[in-house]
């Protein structure tokens, strides 16, 4: 028997020893997935574009909150962050910081809230300019997580989870350094690229899955899109015209949606040319969704993630030859040139830590997908541990389609007879006002009222709270509206009424100029009177409203 060199020294003469070449190959394979030094160097341009898009999405999120945050969660807002954090502290005790990770534990005053938003805006601008991108994106993520963790019902949107998940993974995807350019010396690790693509896949596939699992007949009888454009949270004027296209078009849209979400997205797992075809199918679709419905920054995240289906081999043809950097040329690069040196222990420790975190996210999201599909065979505890950070999410858009458009309108009065409406900034209200295109701006107050209109006031306490705030002439809450009908004074009575809205026909619009018609359904919540001593009293009970969803 031939003794291998080194057996005696190891004291394991009889133990099998793997050939060195096999061990080396295994090490290289692992490092190709987790070590940026051996990363996906054919995705440098794509990464650069994606990170600029992510920075713009962060900017839109912080910018829209800057004008709303005091009225939403300020000390005098509808759901004060301080009250929410206090409730979290009482429930979770010593683990409250884990269950609600937020800078607002330090302070949640109005100046503190707006300061965090300004810091987020500044960091998003730095990230867009590619200055300290990894650090800038980390600051963006911390600031946005701080809001989401403290905002209660005002941060329960899937788009918030999408941004936090993509933002966290991007901390490992982005290049380091103050001004890295394309980051050819610090390419993205393959695991981070794969997880961003995996998020893109799950947004589509899980949305298709919930449509099938919900049992909503509208998806099965191909009528789900018949009133979709009218009933969406914030319609657009383009959606108005698409709504009036023939039923065959709406039915075809249903089929296309299901095919894309349940079938075409699997093209992600095919070779690069197939992924390119997928990219050129889904991108126009997402642009169409943006034009026909205001879903804040949701579709912009999906667009940005979808761009990672492309690679530099394809994009290089659009780059002038004199601008091409060797790092983005199609030829393979010498990976040995990026072998770690003996002094790179700190680097390898970072690779191991980042690999652990990213594998944790990968497992958690896979377990949630398997559970959603009805096969709870994987433990969900790892996913539950990450839940407070919103970095391993389940998605499922439009599982059940709404069957009508309902709008809550706040009205004030000084005599209880003549009522003046508080005008919203973005929600449909005036019949002759065209619905606009506002995304990626997100008016969270308007959005939450759309959801509230589908239920009753007992389960949507933001409605009676808003009534009281208007009676108190709270300027932060009044700032959530377009205008104050009482010019800075408080009315004596406030009520919330419920309307049902429909798009007008094309012929009616030509004759009247109205985009909408509506019917009053009744009093949504109790009308409230403020007495001379400052106490509140119910002036009228809510009406018994017809069923609506």
Regions found by a protein language model. Name each.
Residues 3-4:
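Basic polycationic patches enriched in arginine
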Residues 8, 13-18:
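Short, low-complexity intrinsically disordered segments enriched in A/P/G/S/L with frequent Arg
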Residues 21-549:
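Alpha-helical membrane-anchoring segments
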């Amino acid at each position: 028997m031939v003794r291998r060199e080194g057996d005696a020294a190891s004291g394991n003469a009889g133990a099998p020893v793997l050939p060195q070449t096999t061990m080396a190959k295994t090490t290289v394979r692992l490092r190709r997935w987790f070590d940026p030094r051996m990363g996906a160097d054919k995705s440098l341009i794509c990464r650069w574009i994606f990170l600029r898009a992510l920075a713009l999405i962060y900017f839109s999120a912080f910018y829209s909150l800057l004008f709303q945050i005091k009225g939403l969660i300020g000390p005098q807002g509808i759901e004060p962050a301080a009250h929410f954090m206090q409730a979290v502290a009482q429930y979770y005790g010593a683990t409250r910081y884990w269950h609600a990770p937020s800078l607002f534990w330090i302070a949640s005053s109005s100046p503190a809230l707006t300061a965090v938003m300004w810091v987020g805006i500044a960091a998003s601008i730095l990230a867009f300019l590619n200055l300290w991108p990894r650090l800038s994106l980390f600051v963006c993520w911390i600031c946005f997580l701080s809001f989401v963790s403290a905002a209660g019902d005002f941060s329960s949107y899937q788009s918030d989870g999408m941004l936090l998940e993509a933002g966290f993974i991007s901390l490992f995807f982005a290049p380091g350094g103050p001004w890295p350019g394309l980051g050819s010396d610090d390419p993205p690790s393959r695991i981070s690229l794969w997880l961003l693509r995996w998020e893109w896949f799950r947004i589509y596939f899980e949305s298709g899955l919930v449509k099938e699992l919900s049992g909503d007949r509208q998806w099965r009888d191909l009528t789900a899109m018949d009133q979709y454009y009218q009933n969406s949270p914030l319609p657009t004027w383009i959606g108005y015209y698409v709504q009036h296209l023939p039923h065959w078009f709406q039915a075809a849209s249903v089929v296309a949606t299901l095919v894309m979400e349940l079938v075409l997205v699997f093209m992600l797992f095919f070779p690069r040319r197939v992924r390119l075809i997928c990219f050129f199918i889904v991108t126009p679709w997402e642009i169409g969704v943006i034009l026909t419905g205001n879903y804040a920054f949701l579709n912009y995240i999906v667009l940005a993630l979808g761009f990672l289906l492309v690679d530099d081999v394809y994009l290089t043809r659009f780059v002038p030859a004199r601008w091409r950097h060797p790092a983005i040329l199609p030829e393979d690069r010498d990976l040995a040139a990026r072998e770690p040196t003996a002094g790179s222990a700190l680097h390898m420790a970072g690779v191991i830590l980042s690999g652990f975190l990213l594998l944790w996210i990968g497992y958690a999201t896979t377990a949630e997908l398997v559970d959603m599909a009805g096969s709870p065979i994987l433990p969900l505890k790892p996913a539950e541990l990450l839940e407070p950070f919103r970095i391993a999410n389940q998605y499922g858009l439009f599982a059940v389609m709404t069957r009508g458009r309902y709008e809550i309108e706040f009205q004030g009065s000084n005599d209880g007879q003549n009522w003046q409406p508080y005008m919203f900034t973005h929600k449909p209200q005036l019949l002759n006002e065209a619905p606009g295109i506002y995304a990626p701006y997100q008016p969270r107050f308007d959005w939450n009222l759309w959801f509230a209109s589908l239920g009753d006031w007992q389960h949507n306490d933001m409605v009676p709270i808003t009534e009281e705030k208007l009676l108190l002439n709270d300027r932060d809450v009044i700032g959530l509206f377009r205008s104050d009908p009482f010019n800075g004074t408080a009315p004596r009575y406030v009520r919330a009424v419920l309307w049902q809205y429909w798009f007008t026909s094309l012929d009616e619009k030509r004759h009247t100029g109205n985009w909408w018609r509506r019917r009053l359904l009744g009093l949504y919540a109790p009308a409230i009177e403020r007495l001379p001593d400052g106490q509140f009293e119910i002036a009228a009970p809510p009406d018994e409203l017809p069923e609506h969803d």
